[in-house]
From Swiss-Prot:
Enzyme Commission identifier(s): 3.5.4.30
Annotated site residue numbers, Important for bifunctional activity: G120, Y121
Oligomeric form and interacting partners: Homotrimer.
Protein's recorded name: dCTP deaminase, dUMP-forming
Taxonomic source organism: Methanothermobacter thermautotrophicus (strain ATCC 29096 / DSM 1053 / JCM 10044 / NBRC 100330 / Delta H)
Keyword Chloroplast in annotation: no
PANTHER family linked to this entry: DCTP DEAMINASE
Basic and acidic residues compositional bias, start-end: 165-174
Pathway(s) annotated for this protein in UniProt: Pyrimidine metabolism; dUMP biosynthesis; dUMP from dCTP: step 1/1
InterPro entries associated with the record: dCTP_deaminase (IPR011962), dUTPase-like_sf (IPR036157), dUTPase_trimeric (IPR033704)
Known catalytic reactions: dCTP + 2 H2O = dUMP + NH4(+) + diphosphate
Span list, region Disordered: 161-183
């Protein structure tokens, strides 16, 4: 596997192999080996609820534990210890022979903000807006503005196209085509759904 350089990223975009829409400022967004992505204007945070824990086997919809915030003018403030979901402003589509990773920008990380907790890997065949799992591990609240560059996507070639890429009918591709912050669909995992635990 090899990481795409800026010239290869531009070529893949020009040839329609990678979709990044909108890519409003390619000169600023395309870096030597990545593309800076911006945060959208919709955020989800956990409500304070009276439950001992989130249990994947509980039939309650995890969505009901979340509150949605739309930010048009001004920032979304994330406080120390808080967790929120958002999406990239850009819609991304990958071919069947590329994978991608999302990493936080160092300028954001130096404020104590992480952009993904564990889900930084994007499978071949994915298309949609990427859900960001944002945490403030610092000691001060931080303002995040819609369309602010907060993360970067790195593309890697595969040795061959995936036989069953993300979105294939035989896969449980729970997040294909997402356009809004998507809460966990862990209850749809095979082992949970079929009481294998």
């Amino acid at each position: 596997m090899a990481i795409l350089s800026d010239r290869d990223i531009k070529r893949y975009i020009e040839e329609g192999l990678i979709t990044i829409d909108p890519l409003d400022d390619p000169e600023r967004q395309i870096q030597p080996s990545s593309v800076d992505l911006r945060i959208g204007n919709e955020f989800k945070g956990f409500r304070v609820i009276r439950k001992p824990c989130i249990d994947p086997k509980d039939p309650s919809d995890i969505e009901s534990y979340m509150e949605t915030f739309h930010v048009e003018d001004g920032p979304f403030i994330i406080h120390p210890g808080e967790f929120a979901l958002a999406t990239t402003h850009e819609y991304i589509a990958l071919p069947e022979d590329l994978v991608a990773r999302v990493e936080g920008r160092s300028s954001i990380g130096r404020l104590g903000i992480t952009m993904h907790v564990t889900a930084g890997y994007i499978d071949p065949g994915f298309h949609g807006r990427i859900t960001l799992e944002i945490s403030n591990i610092g000691k001060m609240p931080v303002a995040l503005y819609p369309r602010q560059r907060v993360c970067q996507i790195v593309f890697e070639t595969m040795t061959s196209p995936a036989e069953r890429p993300y979105g294939h009918p035989s896969r449980d591709s729970k997040y294909i085509g997402q356009t809004r912050p998507q809460t966990s669909r862990i209850k749809d995992d095979y082992e949970i759904r079929n009481s294998r635990l």
